[in-house]
Amino acid sequence: MASMERRLGIVGLVLLALLVFGVPAAKAQGNPGAIKVTSSTATTKFAEELKFALQAQSSAGSIEKVDLFYTFGDGKASNRVPTEFTPGKVVTATATKRAQQGEFAPQLDIRYYWRITDSAGNTLKTDPQTVVYADDRFQWQKTGNDRATVQWYGESDSFGKQALGWTIEGLDRLEQKFGIRMSYPANVVIYQSKDDMSKALAPRGATFDKGATVLGEARSNYGTLLMLNQGDARTTLWHELSHLVLHDLVKGPYESNLPAWLDEGLAMYNESDNANDNYQRSLDDAIRKNDVFTVRSMTAPNGVPTKVGIWYGQARSVVRYLLDEHGGRDNMQIGRAHV
C-alpha cells in the first residue's frame, strides 16, 4: 500500500508540475515470391554515420521504391532514411544516416528493416535486423540479465559484475521507495575518463564543456545511461537510473515538458539520503546570500558551472519538501484524478 501510494504520489507530483510548471526473412504484399533480397548489411562509424546497403530483385516488374527504417528503445517509432538506387528488376540501394556527436547513445542496438515495392504493386517488408552503434575506440565487455545490461572497458570482469549489482540495487531502491519499475532493461555504458566520454556527449558550449565534468547522463529515449568510473560511481549510477525510470513513467506527450527541477531533484533525492553534502552546503550558502533560483526559472537546467551546485541542491530541496512534507496523500489525489 505504501509503495502504491508513493507511486501515485510521484505521478501526482509530475502532473502537478506539468500543470503548474544476415538476409532476413520477408513479409510481402501481393505476390509473395516476386521480390527477393539477396543481401542486407549495415555498418556504423561512431559520431559520424550509419550506413545501410541492400541488394534485391523482382521477377514481376521493376523495383520502383526502396525505403529504409530504423528504430531503437521500445521500438514504437520508426525513422525513415532516404535511399539511393536506380530503379530496375535488380537494384543495389544504399542509405546513409549522418550521426552528429552525441546524437545516438553509444553501444546502442539499432534495429532496421527495408520496405521494397515494384511496378506490379508487390511490396516486401523485411524482418528487422540489428546493428550496434559501437564506440569503436575501445574494446567493450558486457554482462547483464533481464533487468539491465552493463558495458565497460579497461577493467576486469569483477568490475562489470559489481556495476551490474549496483544497477539492480538501484532499480530495487526506486521500486521500494516510489513503487515504480522500468518497463524495459536499463543499458549502462561506463567510460573511464572525461576525455573518453566527451565524444559520446552532445556539446553544450565551450564554457560548460571546459568548466564542468559530466559524471553521468541519462539518454531516456534510448534506454541508456552513460557514466564515468570516477568518484562515487554507485551514486552517479543511482542518480541516472532515476532519470530513466521517471521518463519511463511519464513517457508520451508530457515527457518533453517535464521540468528540470523535478527530473533532477528526484534523481538527487533518490541517489543519497545524505542531506549534509556539498550540494546542500552550496544551497545553504546561496540562501544566506539571497542568491537562490525561483522554481519557475528552474524548468530548464542551469548551464553556469559556478551555479551548478546551488541549482542541484535547490532542486533536491524542492522535491524533498513536496514528497516528505506533503507525503503521497495530496499528490495521490491529483494522480488518481488525472491518470
Pin down the residues of each PLM region.
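Bacterial N-terminal signal peptides
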Residues: V11-F21
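Juxtacatalytic substrate-recognition/specificity segment
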Residues: Q139-P259, K289-V292, A300-K307, W311
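Bacterial N-terminal signal peptides that target proteins for export
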Residues: A2-G12
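Pan-zinc metallopeptidase signature
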Residues: V292-R336
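Glycan-association/targeting regions that enable binding to alpha-glucans and other polysaccharides
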Residues: G22-Q141, D146-T149
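Post-HExxH zinc-binding segment in Zn-dependent metallohydrolases
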Residues: L249, S256-T299
